[in-house]
Amino acid sequence: QEDIASILDPAFGRADATQNRTPGSDQHSVAGGVIALAVGPTDANYDFTPTILLLASPIPADTTPEQALTESAVALSDQVPGFRMLDDCPWPTTPESAQLRTGIYIQGRVPITACRWAWIHSDGTNDFLLTATATMTTPAFSNLNEDVLAIIMSMEVRNG
């Protein structure tokens, strides 16, 4: 079984300390980080826990928000070995200019479907690329996709 905390803690600090965070909620806000992590029921067939991870990444001064949004699609394919993007399309609801990327990959023997929503958020001083990435086993996708959409549609990121 995946130990999400052991993956996130070295990179972002304690995973349980991410609830109710905003891009500007701590002294490391310009560096970005984990805003929220949600875990679902483990898929016993693959011993895999589905997750939704919301990240804030600062956009460098020499990069426009539009460039960051476009480049984030390429980064997704580069960051996940074997990732095959199936869709990269505008997300029809708020936030404005959001993109939805979906794809698949194999992790060991586990077939995974990933959905990533990406959009730009400003805290008034800095621009951030926000990504909400849902991962689940491909067989579980048909059972979980409505729950994931409900969570994504209810998310609200506020400045701290």
Residue spans for each PLM region:
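Secretory pathway targeting signatures of secreted, lumenal, and periplasmic proteins
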Residues: 1-60
